[in-house]
Amino acid sequence: MRTKLSLIAFAFALSGQYCTAQTNEPVNDWKPASSNQQGKQYPQVNSEGRVKFRIVAPKAQSVGVSFRDSSAFTKGEDGAWVGYTRPLDEGFHYYTINIDGGEVPDPNSQFFYGSSRWGSAVEVPAKDADFYSLKNVPHGHLREIHYFAKSSNTNRHCFVYTPPDYDQDTTKHYPVLYLQHGAGEDETGWGRQGCAGLILDNLIAEGKTKPFIIAMEFGGNPFGGPRPTNTAPATTGGTNSTFAGPGGRAFTFSAFEKVLIDDFIPFIDGNFRTIADQPHRAMAGLSMGGMQTRSLTLAHLDKFSHIGVFSGGSIAVTNITDMAAFKEKVKLVFVSYGSRELGTNRVAGRGFGGDPKANVAALKAAGINSVFYESPDTAHEWQSWRRSLREFAPLLFKD
């Protein structure tokens, strides 16, 4: 009798395990990702935020994907390998395909520049995606431009967003936001994965922000200066342009600073109908671009009146060497993070200026217009920064 009961109990245990395994199967409501190349059916995304891949590699011995905790890929009779991710955060994610130990882009995905190379990415639909969706509203232009920088004796490449009415009313002049990408990315980032143009188009159409120009340059180190090291000390910003990020990685901003101040701003003012003064000029950036913004705006209060730091540190009261001048010249300090970044080593790391919430509160107490924004349920990723731009833009250039 005991043996029978044991067998029954064992059968129930197996049944429970089987049911659990079944409930972990992906929900079968797959749709092609919006980030796919034209006509490609994979990758696909379901309502759980899981991503399904199908890679045709009939001679491969193994296939996988760079997302952690993904399922093992299985090979079908047609030579195609299929695998799934865990549920991912809403928004944009870079990835690579691994075939027999070699990392390659997914031939089904559009290509985006990230991790210092062109590669694949997938868009997981977000509940709040409406603010960066393509709608039937007037659209601005995202212009790809080459220009020559005398300070570095180099040809430069940039993108400039002009608002929908820019070409209709040729007597109107506009403020400018200088918007910087993160480490491992380039000047294409905000226009492509960041959806900056669509965000501004929609905000302008809804009457939530004044029209302004966005100028996007490469913030890396393209002409032979020192590369990132592990030895540079943290600084408090201001005129010293070497800044230590998480893990002691040092970023040297002096080369970009010279191009920005001596070449890029004069080029934009000389070739677009800008309001070419400090009250109508802003700077913002994500991650490394936020660190650049923090450092360079503190060093050039005569150039920028609005400051946006997205996941790139914050400004402490002790960073401000001339409080009277700062109060007079700076109209806004905006700091943002994804909620899943806060309290992590990325925020607490050297050179990030301390607790961002506390720093914003201290700036407010000192009489400086300061805003802290926390993107819900996101980490150090593009969904945090898209939302940050949405929150930042309506605060700019108020009379």
Predicted regions located by residue number:
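Boundary at the C-terminal end of the N-terminal hydrophobic targeting segment
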Residues: 19-23
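Positively charged n-region of N-terminal signal peptides that target proteins for export
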Residues: 1-5
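Bacterial N-terminal signal peptides
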Residues: 6-17
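Non-catalytic cap/lid and distal C-terminal segments of serine-dependent acyl enzymes
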Residues: 26-35, 39-71, 76-399
